[in-house]
A protein has these predicted regions:
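Second-shell loop/turn segments in exported
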Residues: 31, 86-90, 97-100, 133-141, ...
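Periplasmic-binding protein-like
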Residues: 88, 92-130, 177
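Ligand-site clamp/hinge motif
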Residues: 17-63, 182, 195
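Structural transition elements
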Residues: 121-154, 172-180
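Gly/Pro-rich hinge or "lid" segments in bacterial periplasmic/extracellular proteins
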Residues: 1-25, 29, 37-39, 146, ...
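Ligand-binding "clamshell"
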Residues: 62-74, 213-215, 229-244
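Ligand/substrate-recognition segments at binding pockets and active sites
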Residues: 7, 149, 153-226, 250
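Extracytoplasmic/peripheral linker and loop segments enriched in polar/acidic and small residues
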Residues: 111, 191-208, 212-214, 235-265
């Protein structure tokens, strides 16, 4: 039963003596503490002031496994991270430019550098833990900077173009170190002539402003599933009118053909 709730601080639950099944719950008290900073969560865990936590940055895994007082328990991930491209920014309106960006980013190297063995690349918009819903016909773009350069030239940008790339100001499982990951993305894009300017702002403004007309040119975000159905990943992003991406007018993305497929699915 709930005995205390301090928003942004902690929730305290105590054993309900009137629970319908004798012997349960098996613990007398649970305290859920809000510790936003990953480093602070890890410090609290190592100090013994909390018993367990989640969403520790992958870079701390070796440190965790080396501590005899701690156990690292692995579970399948249930989230995806993505780079959203705004088609109202002229270069990004061309499919070849978007394809070039996909081919210019060395996703496997970035995953290895920032997630280690805790992350994978995937061409689907659902996590690999939902493989039963993933079609083998869907493949990811290859890492091919030369082909990416050729596509940019075909689209009329042989010398590249300027791009503002926004990164999240907070850590999330899908982007545990967003600034550093954004820097890696910028380095890959610079290799094909795209001149990236990194931007960020406070989290509330980031979420609100990313798709307000004209919207961010490109931004990093992700999604952690609420339940085990691909609809929970696809609908919030692509099913109009609730789609949480943008179109050239800064409104929700609405693609009739895609809507029809999602509804049928």
């Amino acid at each position: 039963r709930l005995v205390e709730w301090r928003p942004g601080d902690q929730i305290v639950l105590e054993r309900n003596p009137n629970f319908w099944k004798p012997g349960l719950p098996k613990v007398d008290r649970l305290v859920f503490k809000v510790i936003k900073d990953p480093a602070a969560r890890l410090a609290a865990l190592k100090a013994g002031t909390i018993d367990f936590t989640t969403d520790i940055p992958p870079s701390n895994l070796r440190d965790l496994e080396a501590d005899p007082n701690l156990d690292a328990v692995f579970r399948p991930s249930f989230n995806v991270g993505y780079l959203a491209l705004n088609p109202s920014h002229k270069p990004l309106a061309d499919k070849r430019v978007r394809q070039a960006i996909a081919m210019a980013i060395n996703k496997k190297a970035i995953v290895q550098a920032f997630w280690g063995r805790l992350g994978v690349t995937d061409g689907h918009f659902t996590p690999p833990s939902m493989k039963a819903f993933q079609s083998p016909k869907v493949t990811d773009y290859e890492f091919n900077p030369q082909k990416a350069k050729a596509l940019l030239a075909q689209a009329g940008y042989p010398n590249g173009f300027d791009l503002e790339l926004w990164y999240m100001p907070v850590s999330r499982p899908y982007f545990p170190t967003p600034k550093e990951i954004a820097e890696a993305l910028a380095a890959d894009l610079s290799a094909i002539g795209i001149r990236v300017k990194l931007q960020t702002k406070d989290w509330a403004s980031y979420l609100a402003d990313r798709k307000k007309s004209p919207g961010f040119q490109a931004y990093m975000l992700g999604w952690t599933g609420d339940y085990g159905d691909p609809q929970n990943f696809y609908d919030p992003h692509f099913l109009g009118p609730i789609a949480d991406l943008f179109d050239p007018q800064g409104k929700n993305l609405v693609i009739p053909e895609l809507n029809e497929l999602l509804v049928k699915g």
